[in-house]
Amino acid sequence: MSKYTKQDIIRMVEDEDVEFIRLQFTDMFGTLKNVAVTSSQLEKALNNECMFDGSSIEGFVRIEESDMYLYPDFDTFCIFPWRPQQGKVARIICDIYTADRQPFSGDPRYVLKKAVADAAQMGYQFDVGPECEFFLFDQNNEGQPTTESNERAGYFDLGPVDLGENARRDMVLTLEDMGFEIEASHHEMSPAQHEIDFRYDEALKTADNIMTFKLAVKTIAKRHGMFASFMPKPKYGINGSGMHVNMSLAKDGKNIFADPEGEMGLSKEAFWFIGGIMKHMKGMTVITNPLVNSYKRLVPGYEAPIYIAWSATNRSPLIRIPVTRGAGTRVELRCPDPAANPYLVLAVCLEAGLDGIRNQITPPDAVTENVFEMQLQQRAKLGIESLPGDLEQAVEELEKDDYIKNVLGGHITEKYLEAKRAEWADYRAQV
């Protein structure tokens, strides 16, 4: 059941003196876009009558087929709390439709919706809790972003050592004003690195929340004279930023990954889900780790995963099963980074896990030792493979995985791979 009707939104805009409404959507690479309308055009927007030029968005369509429609999702209506004065600004997240009023296959939100529908056909709801890390860097005298900070704080440090504490508090309060349930916030391992964790939700809401989270963090950081960076590895010699995703499936409101009688308290479905993720992980990596820079993070020595293995007892493998059981039982995938498109990340994770359940893919035994300390021969004996080592290898792995390509659809697969090949070629040409 929808939270808001069209009349609800029109009334809230009038009552709250909202002047501008951002019709937001996300491009193929996870960049937030918007068409802004004034309140006088709101009813037209809510009737799905707002158009934009899709050929201007990278990865969408050619100029000869450029007319596209924005279909607002009423339940995503939200008033931005950082502009409370006269003439407030609100937003609605939109789906993209073609000129003939069909869902656009290149819309990342549509890709996730399809995956969620596949899960629903099997009786499952896909719940996800992300762990979003970011850096707060200084701006230079011209107000341009840098990768510099005078801060030297570390894991769980507090002010006055933590120079970003006040900004982080404001981010938390702002996010709560926008309807987030913030579970924790703290300084991370590296200087100027932070994490804010919000409560899990069903997958589409979580992906929407990640996009909103990044916008709010960047906006509040700028108000504090800082630059919020979601780059996976902005500096050499320190831990990069990840976006771990904690995943579970529910059926009739019950977490089906939990089984008190099962091995490690896990159900067969949980093991099969892990098996599916491991089977398709190489093909998914260019989605979960989309930049040349992403692979600067995925190196030994900085707590980021490299090897395709799982464990319930240590954090060195790719997949971890946190200790909580019962309703909190979940599978944590540790490789995604915050530069990734959350809609595509959650879509490929869900469909890989569902493939594991459908085909009862049993994962290899859990790894109890530190994978980084194993010799090459020991890893080979255990069948432990590595993630792609760079963007070029990741592109090649997706090209080989027909299942993941089908999840993404022909349009996104073609345009995404084309763009990533160009990124790699540009990187190789740099001197």
Q: Where do the PLM segments sit?
A:
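Glycine-rich, acidic/polar active-site loops that bind/position phosphate-bearing ligands
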Residues: 1-431
